[in-house]
Design a protein with these regions (language model features):
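Conserved hydrophobic "DFG−1" position in protein kinase catalytic cores
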Residues: 16-17, 24, 93, 110
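NUDIX/MutT-family hydrolases
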Residues: 92, 101-133
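Short secondary-structure junctions
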Residues: 62-69
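Active-site-adjacent beta-strand/loop module that shapes the phosphate/pyrophosphate-binding cleft
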Residues: 66, 76-99, 113, 128-130
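Conserved Nudix-box catalytic region and its N-terminal flanking loop in Nudix hydrolases
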Residues: 21-57, 61
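Conserved N-terminal beta-strand and adjoining loop/helix that marks the start
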Residues: 1-23, 41
């Protein structure tokens, strides 16, 4: 009998909110994975790194903000444009220091329309976040 192993990398996804808007990034055109898409800021979890630390590191690297508090929203599975399988752990950033700046993407901007994001998985994540906020 042949065994099948599903290998996937961990990805930490941050939802940064201001009023009724959430922060998105347009990935650079020269990215090898999902170039120029509009998506939530995220990044790979390093080996032996806990999810919360990965999220804090990624938000500092990509947005220049120091994350103070987070709330788990959901876990999703996604296959990137290069075939990489990802387990995406999505967190609402409830408190942070600093003002977000674009450090890694083509641009960042505040958005209120989930349909402006390219990935269905990101749209579902923001919907879930909004449902949790209403409770």
């Amino acid at each position: 009998m042949r065994r099948c192993v599903l290998e996937a990398v961990g990805v930490a996804v941050g939802i940064v909110v201001k009023g009724n808007k959430f922060l998105v990034e347009r990935r650079r055109w020269d990215e090898t994975v999902d170039p120029e898409i509009v998506c939530l800021p995220a990044g790979h979890v390093k080996p032996n790194e806990c999810l919360e630390d990965a999220l804090k590191r990624e938000m500092m690297e990509e947005l220049g903000i120091q994350v103070k508090e987070i709330k788990f929203v959901c876990k999703n599975f996604y296959v990137a444009s290069n075939g990489e399988r990802q387990h995406a752990y999505c967190y609402l950033v409830t408190d942070y220091e600093g003002e977000p700046v674009c450090k890694a993407a083509q641009e960042i901007f505040w958005e209120d329309d989930i349909n402006k994001m390219n990935l269905e998985i990101d749209r579902k994540t923001v919907k879930k976040m909004r449902e949790l906020q209403e409770k």
